[in-house]
Swiss-Prot record:
BP GO terms, sorted: translation
UniProt keyword list: Ribonucleoprotein, Ribosomal protein
Superkingdom classification of source: Bacteria
Protein's recorded name: Small ribosomal subunit protein uS10
Amino acid sequence: MQGQKIRIRLKAFDYRLIDQSTQEIVDTAKRTGAQVRGPIPLPTKKERFTVLISPHVNKDARDQYEIRTHKRLLDIVEPTEKTVDALMKLDLAAGVDVQISLG
């Protein structure tokens, strides 16, 4: 796997879960001898929703909700076979979305 790099993008609603998962990936990659660049925090996406709480009139009565999507980016440079095997066996938290690309 000389000259390749693995790019890992993580997404989660809870920043504690994403930071914990990122730390597990970094520790695993460093333990197997790969060089890690990151974690790079990407901009947080904020989605806001406004809901009328009155069943009939009173347009002034509203509730506002927000969902924040936290993102992190990791690059693993010059991964070894041991690195790939260790990352495949890694068990991350259920609330974290992981996208892996080879480049």
